[in-house]
Amino acid sequence: ADWENGKLYEYDVRKLSKPGKNKLRYKGKVAVLIGTGTFSSANMLTNAIKDYKLATLIGEPTAEPGNDFGEIFPFMLPNTYINATTAIKMFMRANGDTGDFSGIKPDIEVRNTPEDIQNKKDRVLDRALQWIQEGR
């Protein structure tokens, strides 16, 4: 569909494909640490990892949803000349679910406490290392 000053592009999510088999792909355990600071491109990567089961996510849910809006477009309001911005893209979950606006949930949920941070202890990293070394 054409707009007055641009174009609208839509992608049919049914045409998106899952990553195929690749004999070069690493077959060992892969842990990806996530949390409330996981956002933007890192959140999109986390989304694909979760939906395609490419690795095990460890930590706490991301603060940004898998379905989110971005790609900021700046413009000036014609009558007031006020500068404004709006999002011009919706980024969708890799699984095609456009209704889920919650954060990406980890496979293994672990949270650092304020005391952990104060004592320079990383409970999330420790749990990831345990999972890799012991398989649980």
Region locations from a protein language model:
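Active-site-proximal beta-strand/loop segments in catalytic clefts of secreted hydrolases
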Residues: L33-G37, G59-T62, T86-F91
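Terminal peptide-recognition signature
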Residues: V30, I49, G96, A128
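Gly/Ser/Thr-rich loop/hinge elements
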Residues: A1-K29, N67-M76, I88-K89, G99
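Low-complexity, Gly/Ser/Thr/Pro-rich intrinsically disordered linker/tail segments
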Residues: D100, I104-R136
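Loop/turn elements at helix/coil->beta-strand transitions in domains of secreted/extracellular proteins
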Residues: K27-K29, K53-T56
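Extracytoplasmic/secreted cell-surface and envelope-processing proteins
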Residues: F39-L45, G66-F69
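Soluble non-cytosolic domains of exported or imported proteins
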Residues: L24, T36-N43, E115-R123
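C-terminal regions of proteins
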Residues: G66-N112
